[in-house]
Swiss-Prot record:
CDD domains: DHPS. This is Dihydropteroate synthase. It catalyses: (7,8-dihydropterin-6-yl)methyl diphosphate + 4-aminobenzoate = 7,8-dihydropteroate + diphosphate. Catalyzes the condensation of para-aminobenzoate (pABA) with 6-hydroxymethyl-7,8-dihydropterin diphosphate (DHPt-PP) to form 7,8-dihydropteroate (H2Pte), the immediate precursor of folate derivatives. The lineage of its organism: Bacteria, Bacillati, Bacillota, Bacilli, Lactobacillales. It comes from Streptococcus pyogenes. Residues 12-260 form the Pterin-binding domain.
Length: 266
């Protein structure tokens, strides 16, 4: 498979989550030193991750805003350290253009924007300037939908076209339906059932549902984040069967065999 100019073996791949934040819902505070980050990256790569997604601000419900300066201070040293030791693709999980530019200069390869370029109006131009892949995620302020699947498809189509209009080659555009941003459990369930429609929009799709609240709901509620990895792996298999090509997860090893097998059947 290809993500922009980068070629990855197989027809599907795993993006390993690396939160260098104090307050992420699943692993906040776990990876705040270079040593701990490199130990975790060792595990992610050994487990089969082809992309490391580095984030410096939590996007969990009720998250605390982080300035671009603080975000840069968190992510840039980690990106440099990872690139110095490993030959692995790095995506920067940010919606701030200032942070994204600093991350690209530090060695990041891919932009992963949970605001789809809408936060400061400059992210799409940055992707075009650096000729890097960008992942555009569905996100909106309120849980109000006429038809959640159709609304998500319309949003992603419009944002992808905006990226093209800004000079981003179509081959550099990936989309993400944005499970949990902001969607009720019912909205997430409907979107899961309609995932094939997202995959038919003409852009490769990232599937990111790892350890989220909808997974807890599917398990009956009251589970801890790390207790959701088995269900996350099952949903990864479902998503790959629907046509997604990239799964973003915390526990890479639990998903690796699923991706390895299903990518040969896609």
């Amino acid at each position: 498979m290809k993500i922009g100019k980068f070629v990855i073996d197989g027809n599907a791949a795993i993006m390993g989550i690396l939160n260098v934040t104090p307050d992420s819902f699943s692993d906040g505070g776990s990876y705040t030193t270079v040593q701990k980050v490199l130990q975790q990256v060792d595990q992610l790569i050994a487990g089969g991750a082809k992309i490391i997604d580095v984030g410096g601000e939590s996007t969990r419900p009720g998250y605390q805003f982080v300035s671009a300066a603080d975000e840069i201070e968190r992510v840039v040293p980690m990106i440099k350290a990872i690139k110095a030791k490993y030959d692995v693709l790095i995506s920067i999980d940010t919606y701030k253009t200032e942070t994204a530019r600093a991350a690209l200069e530090a060695g990041a390869d891919i932009l992963n924007d949970v605001r789809a370029g809408l936060y400061d109006g400059e992210m799409l131009a940055l992707a075009a300037e650096y000729d890097v892949p960008i992942i555009l995620m569905h996100n909106q302020k309120e849980e109000v939908y006429q038809d959640v699947t159709q609304d998500v498809c319309d949003f992603l189509s419009a944002r992808a076209q905006a990226a093209i209009d800004a000079g981003v080659p179509k081959d550099n555009i990936w989309i993400d339906p944005g499970f949990g941003f902001p969607k009720s459990v019912q909205h997430n369930m409907e979107l899961l059932k309609g995932l094939d429609h997202v995959c038919q929009l003409g852009y490769p799709v990232l599937f990111g549902i790892s350890r989220k609240g909808v997974v807890d709901a599917l398990l009956g509620g009251n589970t801890k984040a790390k207790e959701r990895d088995g269900a996350t792996a099952a949903l990864s298999a479902y998503a790959l069967g629907k046509g997604c090509q990239l799964v973003r997860v915390h526990d890479v090893k639990a998903n690796q065999e699923i991706v390895a097998v299903l990518s040969q059947l896609m």
